[in-house]
């Protein structure tokens, strides 16, 4: 199957929202062995949408649309496709009843145009919307499969996973099982990682190896096909073993795992508590950690010590250090980590201090970072020189904190 994703909505062209739907769908289609060759974005204009469909059906046999299924006049996806394919729009009774029930339960008036959301293409396979009003739909015309999905990701993603993906798998009539596994790496660049496993990438057949760099991390997606799922997993195991034999020090987890979730799990496993002193990161590290369920079992507390006054008066960094070496220094990071550990009575204390930019600080350039980690066995400090904008430096600093803690805990 050759797939094309057409996102409909002027807000996408204006840059008001990001096209995360295309990213999600491309990932999901890759997992089931469907190749996506084109991404197209079209505004709320029936003529331009018609042209995009005419082009797409000449080069693709699966076209997935997102957006344009709402109740307003600029929601034209169904109407445009119906006209092109010479299909009528008919009322889906189940969807209509669901819409009526929603307005009845919420005691809100229903506009006449809400009925439009329950219309589907004649002869289509209806994809139920359990998180919104407008159903999706799929149909095959002249050997081209058209799938229409709502625009809001909170509606589109569960609809595709529960109804759209199974529909496509059934249409493909493929006996092979497709298994994917993502390996996650940190503290190694994409080019270095590819160099280390270049021969494996060059020789890939089944499984395939797909590298991707994002936010200071690198991932490898391994995908294998076999009639038996167990054999597909075994093929992936073999390739994973060969990869990790070369780059294991940089590997930290699988699939949707993050450095923060890995750290949380490891702290729980080791029965350790953590306290945090954040200057450079301004609470970002704790924000990421406490967003995870059960974080309270390992996070003892923290201090956002953005000013020297707080560093000195709350975390008792000696004035002499701040005056002679500055807040962005090894000794300051060491003192912050040790004293936040004492303050919160935790097993481990970690500190972050540095220069996020856009201007230099204390004569130190943007990207200068110090991290301190204090335990009962002593204190270690780590110096970094990072690049990127302010937010990138802060996030990478927080991730390096996770990385160094994981190294210590293992």
Swiss-Prot record:
Gene3D superfamilies registered for this protein in UniProt: 3.30.70.2860, CinA-like (3.90.950.20), MoaB/Mog-like domain (3.40.980.10)
SUPFAM superfamilies to which the protein is assigned, alphabetical: CinA-like (SSF142433), Molybdenum cofactor biosynthesis proteins (SSF53218)
InterPro entries per UniProt: CinA, CinA-like_C, CinA_C, CinA_KH, Competence-induced_CinA, MoaB/Mog-like_dom_sf, MoaB/Mog_dom
Signal peptide (UniProt feature, chain positions): none
Domain of life according to the entry: Bacteria
Stored NCBIfam families: cinA_nterm (TIGR00200), molyb_syn (TIGR00177), PncC_domain (TIGR00199), PRK00549.1 (NF001813)
Similarity section: Belongs to the CinA family.
Name of the protein: Putative competence-damage inducible protein
Organism per entry: Anoxybacillus flavithermus (strain DSM 21510 / WK1)
Lineage: Bacteria, Bacillati, Bacillota, Bacilli, Bacillales
């Amino acid at each position: 199957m050759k797939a094309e994703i057409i996102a409909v909505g002027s807000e996408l062209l204006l840059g008001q929202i990001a096209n995360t739907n295309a990213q999600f769908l491309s990932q999901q289609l890759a997992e089931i062995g469907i190749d996506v060759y084109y991404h197209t974005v079209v505004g709320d204009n029936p003529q331009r949408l018609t042209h995009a469909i005419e082009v797409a059906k000449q080069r693709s046999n699966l076209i997935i649309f997102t957006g344009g299924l709402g109740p307003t006049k600029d929601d034209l996806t169904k109407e445009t496709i119906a006209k092109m394919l010479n299909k009528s729009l008919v009322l889906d009774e189940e969807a209509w009843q669901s819409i009526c029930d929603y307005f009845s339960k919420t005691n809100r008036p229903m506009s006449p145009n809400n009925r439009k959301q329950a219309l589907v293409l004649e002869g289509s396979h209806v994809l139920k919307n359990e998180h919104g009003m407008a159903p999706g739909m799929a149909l095959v015309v002249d050997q081209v499969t058209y799938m229409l999905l709502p625009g809001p990701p909170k509606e589109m993603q569960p609809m595709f996973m529960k109804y759209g993906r199974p529909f496509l798998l059934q249409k493909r009539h493929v006996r092979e099982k497709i298994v994917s596994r993502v390996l996650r790496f940190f503290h190694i660049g994409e080019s270095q990682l590819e160099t280390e496993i270049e021969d494996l990438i060059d020789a890939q057949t089944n499984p395939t190896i797909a590298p991707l760099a994002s936010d200071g991390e690198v991932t490898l997606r391994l995908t294998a096909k076999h009639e038996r799922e167990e054999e597909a997993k075994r093929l992936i195991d073999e390739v994973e073993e060969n990869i990790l034999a070369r780059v294991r020090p940089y590997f930290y987890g699988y699939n949707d795992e993050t450095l923060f979730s890995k750290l949380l799990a490891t702290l729980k496993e080791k029965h350790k508590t953590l306290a945090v002193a954040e200057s450079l990161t301004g609470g970002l590290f704790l924000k990421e950690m406490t967003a995870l369920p059960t974080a309270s079992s390992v996070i003892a507390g923290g201090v956002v010590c953005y000013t020297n006054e707080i560093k000195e008066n709350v975390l008792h960094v000696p004035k002499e250090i701040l005056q002679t070496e500055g807040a962005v220094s090894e000794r300051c990071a060491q003192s912050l980590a040790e004293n936040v550990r004492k303050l919160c009575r935790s097993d481990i204390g970690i500190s972050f201090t540095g220069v996020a930019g856009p201007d230099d600080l204390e004569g130190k350039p943007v990207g200068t970072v110090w991290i301190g980690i204090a335990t009962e066995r002593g204190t270690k400090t780590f110096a970094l020189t990072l690049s990127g904008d302010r937010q990138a430096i802060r996030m990478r600093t927080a991730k390096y904190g996770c990385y160094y803690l994981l190294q210590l805990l293992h």
